Amino acid sequence: MINIRKTHPLMKIINHSFIDLPAPSNISAWWNFGSLLGVCLTIQILTGLFLAMHYTSDTLTAFSSVAHICRDVNYGWLIRNLHANGASMFFMCLFLHVGRGIYYGSYLYKETWNIGVILLLTVMATAFVGYVLPWGQMSFWGATVITNLLSAIPYIGTTLVEWIWGGFSVDKATLTRFFAFHFILPFIIMAMVIVHLLFLHETGSNNPTGIDPNSDKIPFHPYYTIKDILGLMFMLLTLLLLALFSPDMLGDPDNFTPANPLNTPPHIKPEWYFLFAYAILRSIPNKLGGVLALLASILVLLIIPLLHTSNQRSLIFRPISQMLFWMLTANLFILTWIGGQPVEQPYIIIGQLASIMYFLLIIILIPAASILENYLLNPK
């Protein structure tokens, strides 16, 4: 009896990707986040699909259609809460996944890393346009402020902003096109995830030691399928606790007020997962400079493989670089906190110092520490 799993054209691909895939024998729970992100994406697409069945992308009815979903649709409140908090779980997993990649030197698989960074940007774009859809105060003003940043581009800025708006302000045309983008982007993300996996399976997974793992591989199933299910249980528990007990904890109270172009909220701020980048944007008093810093805060990930100066791949045996890595992590927490604070002292100066430290650590300090560690290990 020939095993259909190994012969059928479609099954064969799934088999080589998730069942008989040779995986390093020592990968830790930090390697769970890839599969968790896959689950997050699936949850978001499914809940989003059901929300889209009842949502109307019109400025007059968008806000009330979301209220209608929560009040009148069977389990609409649950679908909406899962979708809103699912986004938070998605970003938590994303940040941990990227952090794992930096810590263990996974960025040396350049193709996988680069498409991963593009994926991160695409997910951020999707979350941004999605946040506009409920048409609350923060939706409207967030859309106005962030799209307006493009007007900092010389010559074409203003024209570009009005082209994106579909008029002279954020209005019906903007909401309709943002809904269209929010619907299509997750499917584009899905295709990119497949490419991400394709590149990863060209090289095989990295492992905590950073040493070539080819001498000791085990099949993905049952070992890592079971291990991933454990991580999945933890994530689903967290998501359900959030969605069922405090669904609005991570949201903004201003978004429960329908959008009003005549009334600006006292503090315009994005969702928590954008606050670090928002803090970097606000820390520069010049509009164009702020926009460039905002872009650089994410795009700097693309040059990390070029900044790898160590003779070792992973940080596991490099205490100086480890300390700087955790400083970078703490710095991102500080930036996240600052992004949610009003623009006044001492928050302004803290934000500026944290922004400088962010780029300094990635571009100069960690590569310099790696060179020092090379010398300390081999002083010849």
Curated annotation (Swiss-Prot):
The entry's keywords: Electron transport, Heme, Iron, Membrane, Metal-binding, Mitochondrion, Mitochondrion inner membrane, Respiratory chain, Transmembrane, Transmembrane helix, Transport, Ubiquinone
A molecular function GO annotation: metal ion binding
Gene name linked to the record: MT-CYB
Residues given in the record as a ubiquinone binding sites: H201
Native source species: Tarsipes rostratus (Honey possum)
Superkingdom to which the source organism belongs: Eukaryota
Cofactor(s) recorded in Swiss-Prot or TrEMBL: heme b
Main localization of the protein described in the UniProt heading: mitochondrion
Sequence positions that bind heme b b566: H97, H196
Extra facts: Heme 1 (or BL or b562) is low-potential and absorbs at about 562 nm, and heme 2 (or BH or b566) is high-potential and absorbs at about 566 nm.
Family of this protein: Belongs to the cytochrome b family.
Membrane topology, from the record: Multi-pass membrane protein
Quaternary structure (record): The cytochrome bc1 complex contains 11 subunits: 3 respiratory subunits (MT-CYB, CYC1 and UQCRFS1), 2 core proteins (UQCRC1 and UQCRC2) and 6 low-molecular weight proteins (UQCRH/QCR6, UQCRB/QCR7, UQCRQ/QCR8, UQCR10/QCR9, UQCR11/QCR10 and a cleavage product of UQCRFS1). This cytochrome bc1 complex then forms a dimer.
Note describing how the cofactor binds: Binds 2 heme b groups non-covalently.
Binding positions (heme b b562): H83, H182
TM region positions: 33-53, 77-98, 113-133, 178-198, 226-246, 288-308, 320-340, 347-367
Gene Ontology CC entries for this record: mitochondrial inner membrane; respiratory chain complex III
Keyword Thylakoid tagged: no
Pfam name, any one: Cytochrom_B_C
Purpose: Component of the ubiquinol-cytochrome c reductase complex (complex III or cytochrome b-c1 complex) that is part of the mitochondrial respiratory chain. The b-c1 complex mediates electron transfer from ubiquinol to cytochrome c. Contributes to the generation of a proton gradient across the mitochondrial membrane that is then used for ATP synthesis.
PROSITE patterns: CYTB_CTER, CYTB_NTER
Name of the protein this chain belongs to: Cytochrome b
Record Gene3D superfamilies: Cytochrome Bc1 Complex, Chain C
GO BP, sorted A to Z: mitochondrial electron transport, ubiquinol to cytochrome c
